[in-house]
Amino acid sequence: MSRYRGPRVRIIRRLGTLPGLTNKSAPQLKPSSINQSTSNKKISQYRIRLEEKQKLRFHYGITERQLLNYVRIARKAKGSTGEILLQLLEMRLDNIIFRLGMTPTIPGARQLVNHRHILVNGYIVDIPSYRCKPQDFITIKNKQKYESIISKNIELYQKSKIANHLTYSSLEKKGLVNQILDRESIGLKINELLVVEYYSRQA
């Protein structure tokens, strides 16, 4: 299944707010509409797991195959499969750029990476799925061209605090990965255990 490129509002209307996909909030449904929709059909456990899986896929902007591969990697690692899955997704380069506040969405971050504008530890990295590590530092190749845009994004984003595992220096225009993030620093409302359960027969 390919990466979704359709209307983003349609997705958040169905799944709720997904900050990585769009900075728009999910539309509020009228109570009568909610009662009517829930009374018309009983929500199955499969659908609940499916929707949690879709939240991860659309928020991080990855394909079905990519998400399944991340689940398989998480299953082989020691520790909580769900928590490791979230760590793998959060440490992607495109997500780190987004969480630093350098772009308003993950698709915007992915575009910067694909166009070879991002340096990791001083070297160009053009792979959005590149897995960042503690002490990696992220900078923009053409600072003069993007300085005003990045600064504006940072100013808007820092109204909501940057996660503890990251640091951004406005003076040096440089982001730093301090450590692997903990569960509380995830920027998405998600039940990762339901995602693991969804893939239980495939991973």
Curated annotation (Swiss-Prot):
Subcellular location, record wording: Plastid, Chloroplast
Principal location: plastid
GO annotation, cellular component aspect: chloroplast; small ribosomal subunit
MF-aspect GO terms: rRNA binding; structural constituent of ribosome
S4 RNA-binding domain ranges (all copies): 91-154
GO BP: any one term: translation
InterPro entries attached to this UniProt entry: Ribosomal_uS4, Ribosomal_uS4_bac-type, Ribosomal_uS4_CS, Ribosomal_uS4_N, S4_RNA-bd, S4_RNA-bd_sf
SMART domains per the UniProt record, alphabetical: Ribosomal_S4, S4
Swiss-Prot/TrEMBL keywords: Chloroplast, Plastid, Ribonucleoprotein, Ribosomal protein, RNA-binding, rRNA-binding
Family: Belongs to the universal ribosomal protein uS4 family.
PANTHER family tied to this protein: 30S 40S RIBOSOMAL PROTEIN, SMALL RIBOSOMAL SUBUNIT PROTEIN US4M
Biological function: One of the primary rRNA binding proteins, it binds directly to 16S rRNA where it nucleates assembly of the body of the 30S subunit. With S5 and S12 plays an important role in translational accuracy.
Assembly and oligomerization: Part of the 30S ribosomal subunit. Contacts protein S5. The interaction surface between S4 and S5 is involved in control of translational fidelity.
Name by which UniProt lists this protein: Small ribosomal subunit protein uS4c
Gene transcribed to yield this protein: rps4
